[in-house]
Amino acid sequence: GGNDGPDQWSTLGLTCQPALNCTVGDGFNSIVFGDIDNSDSGCSANGFGNFTDLSTDLAQGDTYDVSMETGYGDQHVRAWIDFNDDYNYTADEIVLDNYIIGEGQGSGTHTGTAQFTIPADATLGSHYIRFASAWQTGVPDNPCEATSWGETEEYTVNIVESLGISDVDLLNLRIYPNPVDGNNVTILSSVSGDKFVEVFDINGRK
């Protein structure tokens, strides 16, 4: 008996959908990040927007801007990525926490741009990302818990390997002879895998 239970719950293949009220402007009028541009989305039915058909690639270890617009100020925002694909959102999956759009403001259009970083060891592949807002209070730790005013929206992200090259790899690059004698050069590098090289002359021509 009693009401004790897990902090998160899910059904097969579905995340929980807390019912929130965004009818007077709370929540998200738009969310833009990566290749996703969900502008003028308005208030979702029952305060939950399933936009998982919209997807973008995000790279391990990289930092991204997310631009958000609301129709009512003092929106506290949290975001999770379901890295283990269990349809629950847990504390170790939070990528954006307690960002406030239009702090201290009331009705009207308010925008904000936050940043979030993908962990360097994030699981590759497709995952859900959830953005949740709550008016004048932090988003509950339990992502299934409803607040009076706010909205929840879900999208899909595809985690890919970072394409960056470290400074150490660059320092280990060796090209000889220098100056070039004839048409042949030797390039030594600690970078494994395929390499792409462009050669320019002193005037900047390829």
Label each residue range with its predicted role:
Residues 1-162:
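A broad "non-catalytic interaction surface" signal
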Residues 166-206:
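C-terminal outer-membrane/trafficking sorting elements
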